[in-house]
Regions:
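Outer-membrane beta-barrel "beta-signal"
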Residues: 163-167, 233, 283-304
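Short glycine/proline- and aromatic-enriched beta-strand/turn motifs that initiate or cap beta-hairpins
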Residues: 19-79, 295-302
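Membrane-embedded beta-strand positions of outer-membrane beta-barrel proteins
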Residues: 26-30, 66-70, 109-111, 145-147, ...
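Residue-level signature of outer-membrane beta-barrel architecture
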Residues: 56-58, 99, 137, 168-170, ...
Length: 304
């Protein structure tokens, strides 16, 4: 068993991971909502969502780690009050490097090519290209600061997200905070060996190519924007396997459909620069979100 863990440590450990003492190899999320009313009619729709995040870091040497994996997401919801339920989503590859410069500074760059569409047919508009560049300053074993930039070639135009955050673990290892604003934030407290309670924030702006969303609209895209706030319980079946049950609420949520060529010059998290686009559908209300998450984690606390 000791030989097994030593091999696993050599494959998966890096300065990026050791700062947190674990790596989440698999995260699987299943979400649903109650019915949400459209603004312009009595029609209602649910939002069903499935996400998977697989991460495989491979240590090349003491200072360099290869980062690989993939992201998958699928949505089922109405985009038009009088329309059918539409399926759309994305598949993205993760390929990057993590470089340790010295005992304090660590850099990470990850390429994120993806297909984002309804997968009805294939075209160049299905493809998007993203990159994340991140620097981390390790203040102590339990504290580091992070800053960087995310870019993606969204269908509405180039999208830039400056990022800043931190990771903190209390000395008794009961309180943990992992923050990367404006994209996500998480804080949790270990109540018992088997149970953590926490709060979580996720903010996203993404776009997906649509084919024939209605008979009169053959070439469009949907821009999804949401801010989600959750409270959750995490059940720790073992050091590796966990289940989270989350209840949350969405703020400023929308799934807005635009003509394929209706774009802006570029976008930032809080604004878009360029001409005002013509929204083709109506929004529906914010509301509750229920989510269950399975996590498979490799923890190095006891195996160094």
């Amino acid at each position: 068993m000791k030989k097994y863990w030593r091999l696993f440590y050599l494959i998966f450990s890096s300065e990026l991971i050791i700062a947190q003492n674990y790596v989440d190899i698999l995260k699987l999320n299943l979400s649903t909502t109650p019915y949400n009313k459209f603004d312009t009619s009595s029609s209602k729709t649910k939002i069903n969502q499935l996400d998977a995040d697989v991460t495989i870091p491979i240590k090349l040497n003491s200072k360099l780690t290869l980062l690989s994996g993939f992201l998958y997401e699928n949505f089922q919801t109405k985009l038009f009050a009088d329309g059918p339920v539409k399926n759309f989503g994305s598949i993205a590859l993760k390929l990057g490097l993590n470089k340790t410069f010295n005992e304090h500074w660590i850099g990470t760059m990850v390429l994120l090519p993806k297909i984002a569409s309804d997968f009805v047919s294939r075209s160049s508009n299905d493809f998007q290209y993203g990159v994340v560049a991140l620097m981390k300053y390790k203040k102590a074993d339990h504290l580091n600061y992070k800053f960087g930039m995310y870019y993606n070639s969204e269908l509405f135009g180039p999208f830039f997200v400056p990022m800043v955050g931190l990771y903190f673990l209390s000395e008794n290892k009961k309180f943990e905070a992992n923050i990367m604003l404006p994209l996500n934030a998480d804080a949790n407290y270990k109540l018992t060996k088997f149970l953590n309670a926490g709060i979580n924030f996720n903010g996203q702006i993404r776009s997906y190519h649509l084919n024939h969303v209605t008979p009169s609209l053959p070439h469009t895209y949907v821009a999804r924007s949401t801010n989600e706030f959750y409270a959750y319980l995490r059940f720790n079946f073992s050091e590796s396997m966990m289940l989270q049950t989350k209840c949350g609420i969405s703020v400023a949520r929308n799934f807005r459909v635009y003509e394929e060529n209706d774009k802006v010059n570029f976008g930032l998290p809080a604004t878009f620069i360029g001409q005002k686009r013509q929204q083709l559908n109506s929004d529906f209300s914010n509301g509750l979100i229920f989510q269950a998450s399975f996590i498979y984690r490799v923890n190095f606390n006891k195996n160094k």
